[in-house]
């Protein structure tokens, strides 16, 4: 459950460390983003010489949330942090590596490149 002003960890190697959600890109009046949703975010913390720098406005896809995601089989999954992967306008990851596990819901939403880069899919 990500809403505007929420800080997220960045789970890739674009150089950003923390981003803040500005807008949820899901319908005209969506309040919250969950796993697999695209958000617009501002880079709040970045390492030097990265692909993105502090203050950049980027698109990102949410890959982990603290709030549990309910699945059709009745199970639920939650993670220890809120995390996202920075993407370009074609919805492909800007980085070449993804850190930490990602949720299976990304496969259903069409983010196959992120799923293949992730070390673990839960």
From Swiss-Prot:
GO terms for biological process: translation. PROSITE patterns: RIBOSOMAL_L14. Pfam families: Ribosomal_L14. Coiled coil: none annotated. It comes from the Bacteria. InterPro entries: Ribosomal_uL14 (IPR000218), Ribosomal_uL14_bac-type (IPR005745), Ribosomal_uL14_CS (IPR019972), Ribosomal_uL14_sf (IPR036853). One of its GO terms (molecular function) is large ribosomal subunit rRNA binding. One of its GO terms (cellular component) is cytosolic large ribosomal subunit. Keywords: Ribonucleoprotein, Ribosomal protein, RNA-binding, rRNA-binding. HAMAP family: Ribosomal_uL14. Part of the 50S ribosomal subunit. Forms a cluster with proteins L3 and L19. In the 70S ribosome, L14 and L19 interact and together make contacts with the 16S rRNA in bridges B5 and B8. Binds to 23S rRNA. Forms part of two intersubunit bridges in the 70S ribosome. Belongs to the universal ribosomal protein uL14 family. This is Large ribosomal subunit protein uL14. The gene is rplN.
